[in-house]
Amino acid sequence: AYTKGKPHPMIDPEKRIECMESAVDDESTGVILLDIMLGYGSHEDMAGALIPTIEELKKKAEDAGRKVFFVATVCGTRKDFQGYDEAVKKLKDAGVIVCENNKLAVRTAIQAIGLDFEEPVKEIRTKKTAVVEKAEPSEKLMQLLSQKPKIINVGLKSFAEVAEDFGCEVVQYDWMPPAGGDVRLIRTLNFLRNYEGIDEANKRVIAKVVASQPVIKHVKRAKEVIPQIAEGKVILHAGPPIEYKNMPDPVQGSCVGAVLFEEWADNEADARALLESGEVKFIPCHHCNAVGPMGGITSANMPVFVVKNETDGNEAYCTMNEGIGKVLRFGAYSEEVVNRLRWMRDVLGPTLDRAITELGGLSVNPLVAKAVAMGDEFHQRNIAASLAFMKEVAPTITRLDMSEKDRYDVIKFLADTDQFFLNIMMATAKSVMDGARTITDGTIVTAMCRNGVEFGIRIAGMGDEWFTGPVNTPKGLYFTGYDEEDGCPDMGDSAITETFGVGGMAMIAAPAVTRFVGAGGYEDALRVSNEMAEITIDHNPNFIIPTWNFQGTCLGIDARLVVEKGITPVINTGIAHKIAGYGQVGAGTVHPPMECFEKAIVAYAKKLGFEA
C-alpha cells in the first residue's frame, strides 16, 4: 500500500512522480503507463502537474543513451471541468503517446519496447435474456429519483463540496483508517481488543482512580520523606531518565540553582564543574514516588508536599510552586531565585506543615470538585483551587506562634501565587495514579512526562517501563519580546495532571485558558474536551464540569484508543526560554509523540504472546 497515509494519486501527483522517477532510474524500464482521471474529486490539472517531470525524465533517459516511452489514457468527458481535449493536447505536446482506452494503451506499450502480443480468440456465446418481474418502485425510491439526495460523505471533502454546489443536503464525516492504516498496528489493536480481560482490567484501574482519597498530610524537606535523596549529592529531575550532559539548557540551569541552594558550590562556575564531574547523581522524580514541574529539579532540602492516597496507603511528593517569571523550574538560578527557595525552606514550608498538621490533613477531592466548578482546569488555571487552599489554611496560620512579618509574608505569597495549587494537584495525581497502577494489567496510561529531550509514558500492563519518543515544542502565546524561536522543547512531570484527567483534558472547565495558551475560545475548548473523551473510557463522577453539560472530567486514557483514532492527549504547559536564566516566556499546548503509545501497545501485546 504505497499510498498509505497519502492522498490517492488521482488527487495528488506527488507519489506518482516519485514512482516515475524511480522507474526511470531502473535501466530495465522502457515504457511508463499512466492514466489521467478527470472529474470531481480529481486533481484540477493532473496532466499539467505531471508534464514537467515527464519532460525532465525523458531528457534524463536520452542523456543516458536510453529511450523511455510514456503512454497514457485520459479517462473523462468533455464536460469535466479539467477539460478532456486540453488534457490530451498537453500530454501529446510533451511527447506522451495518448491512447483512447487501456487495452490500446497496453498494446501500444508492448509494441513500443519491440514486443508483440497476440490476443487470444474469445468464445462467442449466445446471449441469454433474463426474465425479470416488473415491480412497483417504493415511495423511498421515487423520492430518491425525484428529489435531491441527502448525502453522508465519508472521506474526501471535495466530493461533499460538489454536492453542496448542486443544492444537496450534505453531512461531511471525517474518517480515517485505524492507526493511520498501519497494518502492523491494526493487527496489534485487533489482538488487544479481543484479548480477554483487558477491558475489565482497565475498568479496575479507573475504579481505583475514582475511589482514591488523596490527603495533604505534611510539607517536609525532601530528604525527610524520599530516601533516595537523603544522602550524598542527589538531584531528582522531570521526565524519563536522562544524563546531565543531554539535558536542555534550562534544566541544566535549574541544576545549577539546586547546587547553589544546597551550598555544594559557591558560584555558577563551580556548580557547573561539579555537575559535569559526575559527582552528582540524577534520578527521575517518578522513580522516587515524586513529580516535579518543568525541569522537575528537586534536592534534599527543598520543601515538598506530602500527599497520601488514603485508599491505597501510598504517598507522593512535589516541590512547592515558586510563583511566575524567573524561577528555578524554568531554569533561572540568580541570587533572587536561590534566596526565594531558602525562604520557602525556612518559612513557607514549616508554616504550611504546622497549619496542615493542626488541621489533621487536608482532603484534596473537595478542593478539586469545588475549583473545577469555578473554572479551574488545574494545569494553567489554578486560581480557584489556590484560593480554596488558602481559605482552609489561613485561619490556622493566623493562630500560629510566629513573627508577624513571616505570617504576613506567607499569606501574601499564597494570595499572590495563582498557580500555587498546581504542585498540590501534581502530587495528588501522582498518588492516585500510582495507587491505580497496582493493577498490573491493561492499557490505561498511568504516567506522562518529559525531560526536554524525550517524552515518556507508562501503561498499567507494563509497570515501570517507559515508552519514549522525541519531545515536541509547545505551540502557544509568548510574552512580549519573545517568539517560537526562543521556546525550549517541552519538559516537566506536570502532564501527570492530564493523565489524571484534568489540565488540557479538561479544557472546557476553563474556557478562559484557551486564550492564554493560544488555543482559541469556548468552541475550541469544547472541541478539545470532546476529542479527549474519544480516547478515554469514562468520566470521573467526583469532578463535575458545569460547562460540559455536567459531565465529569475525562477518566482513563486508553493507549489503544490513542493509536486507533490517531488522537494524542493535549497538554497545557508553560514555555521556558531555551537559554537558562530567562525563565518562563510563554504558555501553550503540546502533544505527546504518537510513537510512545504505539511502542506501548506493541510491547504489551508481545507480553501477552502476540507478534504482529
List each language-model region with its residue ranges:
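Anaerobic metallocofactor- and corrinoid-dependent redox/one-carbon enzyme cores
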Residues: A1-E18, P52, G76-T77, P120-A612
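ATP-dependent carboxylate/acyl-activation modules
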Residues: A1-L34, G39, F69, C75-T77, ...
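Generic beta-strand/beta-sheet core signal
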Residues: L34-D35, T73, N101, Y173
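Charged helix-capping and loop-helix junction motifs
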Residues: M46-T53
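Short, structured coil segments at secondary-structure junctions
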Residues: K92-G95, F166
